Structures are given as C-alpha cells and as structure tokens.
Amino acid sequence: MPSFDIQSELNKHEVSNAVDQANREVATRFDFKGSGATYKYEGNSITLQAETDFQLKQMIDILQNKFAKRQIDVAHMKLEDPIIQHKSAQQTVMLLEGIDQTAAKKIIKLIKDQKLKVQAAIQGEKVRVTGKKRDDLQSVIGLLKEQEIGLPLQFDNFRD
C-alpha cells in the first residue's frame, strides 16, 4: 500500500550557515560597529545579544532574511521575550522541530474529516499516512498545504 510521512524537520547545517552569515553581516554593518552584537547557536536555540532593544529587532530581521535565503522556513522560529538590562539586551529564539502530539492529532483530524480512504497514525514526531490509491495521498498533501497548522511540514518517504 502506498504511504508517506509528514514531518517538521530542520537542516541544522543550513541553520548554522545562516547564523554564521548573520554574524558576519552584524560585524560589518555600520549601525552595529562597536556594539558587540552577536548570535550564538546552541542546540535548538539561538541567543541574540545586543546593546538595545532596537538592535535586537534589527538582528531578528537579519536572521529571518538569512533563513529565507537558505530556504529554511521562518515558522521554525519561536521568539522568546527579550531580557533588557542597563547596557545589554538579550533574546532567545527557540527552533521548533518535530510534530508534537497536539499538532499530530490536529493533522489526523483534518485528514479524517475529509472522508478519504486513508489511514493516519502518529509515529514519534512523524505522522504516517497510508492508503490504497496514490491519488488519495496526493489529495491529503494538497489539503495540508492549504491548511494553517502553525508548523512547516515536509512530506517524504513515499512508498508504493
């Protein structure tokens, strides 16, 4: 039976490259000269450090542009509240990866509401969809691309 997986994954190498490019741009921009503004990429988070809140907002914009140039969906980014002190401002950007249980249940409910002859099952941080016809699977992909789920989804592991 044909099947495919729905997942939400990040290419960590591309994220690292985007952060490096953003660091280079901040180091060479005139309005950031001598400010000590930096990005630090650790695990599933990126920490932004600058002198003012305004610089943090500019740094977020730079990071989003670098993500877009590297074909990384900016929906993977979840901005935490900034921590602003006397001469420094810091903000953490969490990188969302994988489909959590609530999002997986929402995806399965959307698929079942269409009354297509497919089965969807949660497998860890992925959702596997199986069906008898390839056309049904393609209509599920079209449906999920139209819906606003709040996560960037990738469709892979197609099998016949």
From Swiss-Prot:
Q: Which cellular component terms (GO) are annotated to the entry?
A: cytosol
Name the Pfam families on file. Answer: DUF520
Annotated keywords:
Nucleotide-binding
- Has UniProt tagged this entry with the keyword Magnesium? no
Superkingdom, natural source: Bacteria
The molecular function terms in GO held by this entry are: nucleotide binding
Which InterPro entries does this entry report, sorted A to Z? DUF520, UPF0234-like_C, UPF0234_N, YajQ-like_sf
UniProt function note: Nucleotide-binding protein.
Q: What PANTHER family does UniProt report for this protein, alphabetically?
A: UPF0234 PROTEIN YAJQ
Q: What family is reported? A: Belongs to the YajQ family.
Question: What's the protein name?
Answer: Nucleotide-binding protein CBU_0114
Q: Which organism is it from?
A: Coxiella burnetii (strain RSA 493 / Nine Mile phase I)
